[in-house]
Amino acid sequence: MIASIEQAIKQRLSDGLGQMVSGVHTYGGEFDGEGLAQVVNQFPAVWVMFAGITDSEPHDTRRTRYQVTGHFTVLVGDRASGSEADSRFGGLHRNDVGTYRLMQAVRLLLINQTMGLCIGRLKPGKAKSLFSKQMELDAISVFALDFETHWFEDALRDGDWPRPTVSGEQQAQVYAD
């Protein structure tokens, strides 16, 4: 389910933001270490990542179904040739979007959405600045926006193993969304 939710968030943001950003990506540590200089060339852009499961509560009296609460984080980044404030507020040029506008657009596109999945509606969480700094001629700004949702997972009976059904020559999938 986690992969399906992350892909649905990426697709909704890609469709909704359109040419406002250069792309919507899965986050894989691009802001860590020396990769930052390369990532800045993609700004304005958005990254989506699964931030973790924060709770699993039994949903039935037999404790065979659990409501799982998961968090997803959307990173928005932009740069401006000028001050650090310009990277947040945007500028006069079409490509000078600004991280504040990106944050507003991402929240508008995601809050209260299920994206056609069997999940709870996305709830907004914290929004925080990851960093704002001057890099040579450009100023950059990156913010993280948290979203929460829930879904249900069924537990196997004690001692049981998943038993996939196989028809014909189709490969059995034990673990699937």
What are these regions (language model features)?
Residues M1-F31, L36, G52-D177:
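Charged, amphipathic alpha-helical segments and their flanking helix caps
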Residues N41-S56:
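A short, hydrophobic beta-strand-centered structural micro-motif
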